[in-house]
């Protein structure tokens, strides 16, 4: 490309000087390796063109995000109220729960996007009782955009710890198990070490 500029007299003196030095250096390396620079350059160009022809357009594209929905539009947009509200901010995520809920079976559902088989962006997560009542929520803060799958995982751990403190049984949806937690016990919820459960419970208890 630079030689074409020089051939068309588009380069200034320093440009032409650098070009001559680089050409001399290339010839020296070519002699050392026993290569003809022009022939090697043409061969390299042909290799690149062949690779691009053989690869399909799909193979060269970045994978697109997938949007997974545990909740219906009604479940996402429904208003809910807390008798004993508790709210905690963890990074760019807001965690809410109703501390009046006790001895319930609760499932966590979420709508989120996935890329490379990992949670990319959480849209909304809510905790539902068997009766369908909403008792907890994790949502991104509009003022602090951006979070990782680890941020979401930690926030879910805080929510689970708070709900379990009141003797509720919590499990997560299949989609969350697959893309957010990667591992779960036989009850469909992430295994939390006893010391982590106690730590989260103490944190929520002290904040009350």
From Swiss-Prot:
Region called CPSF4-binding, residue ranges: 158-193
Species of origin: Influenza A virus (strain A/Teal/China/2978.1/2002 H5N1 genotype W)
Nuclear localization signal (motif): residue ranges: 17-21
Residues spanned by motif Nuclear export signal: 115-124
Cell compartment(s), UniProt: Host nucleus; Host cytoplasm
GO aspect biological process, one term: symbiont-mediated suppression of host cytoplasmic pattern recognition receptor signaling pathway via inhibition of RIG-I activity
Region: PABPN1-binding, residue numbers: 201-208
Name by which UniProt lists this protein: Non-structural protein 1
Keywords: Eukaryotic host gene expression shutoff by virus, Host cytoplasm, Host gene expression shutoff by virus, Host mRNA suppression by virus, Host nucleus, Host-virus interaction, Inhibition of host innate immune response by virus, Inhibition of host interferon signaling pathway by virus, Inhibition of host PKR by virus, Inhibition of host pre-mRNA processing by virus, Inhibition of host RIG-I by virus, Inhibition of host RLR pathway by virus, Interferon antiviral system evasion, RNA-binding, Ubl conjugation, Viral immunoevasion
Signal sequence bounds: none
Region ranges (Disordered): 184-208
Domain of life: Viruses
Taxonomic path: Viruses, Riboviria, Orthornavirae, Negarnaviricota, Polyploviricotina
Post-translational modification: Upon interferon induction, ISGylated via host HERC5; this results in the impairment of NS1 interaction with RNA targets due to its inability to form homodimers and to interact with host EIF2AK2/PKR.
InterPro entries according to UniProt: NS1 (IPR004208), NS1A (IPR000256), NS1A_effect_dom-like_sf (IPR038064), uS15_NS1_RNA-bd_sf (IPR009068)
């Amino acid at each position: 490309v630079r030689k074409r500029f020089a051939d068309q007299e588009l380069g200034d003196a320093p440009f032409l000087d650098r070009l001559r030095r680089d050409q001399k250096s290339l010839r020296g390396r070519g002699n050392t390796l026993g290569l003809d620079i022009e022939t090697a350059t043409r061969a390299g160009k042909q290799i690149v063109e062949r690779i691009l022809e053989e690869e399909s357009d799909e193979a060269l594209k970045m994978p697109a995000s997938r949007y997974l929905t545990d909740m219906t539009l009604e479940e996402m947009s429904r208003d809910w109220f807390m008798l004993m509200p508790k709210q905690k901010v963890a990074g760019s995520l807001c965690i809410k729960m109703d501390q009046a809920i006790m001895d319930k079976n609760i499932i966590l559902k979420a709508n989120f996007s996935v890329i490379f088989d990992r949670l990319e962006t959480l849209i909304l997560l809510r905790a539902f009782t068997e009766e369908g009542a909403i008792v907890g929520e994790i949502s991104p803060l509009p003022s602090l955009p951006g979070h990782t799958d680890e941020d979401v995982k930690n926030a879910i751990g805080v929510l689970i710890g708070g709900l379990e403190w009141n003797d509720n049984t919590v499990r997560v949806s299949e989609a969350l198990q697959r893309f957010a937690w990667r591992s779960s016990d036989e009850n469909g919820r992430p295994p939390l070490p006893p010391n982590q459960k106690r730590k989260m419970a103490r944190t929520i208890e002290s904040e009350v």
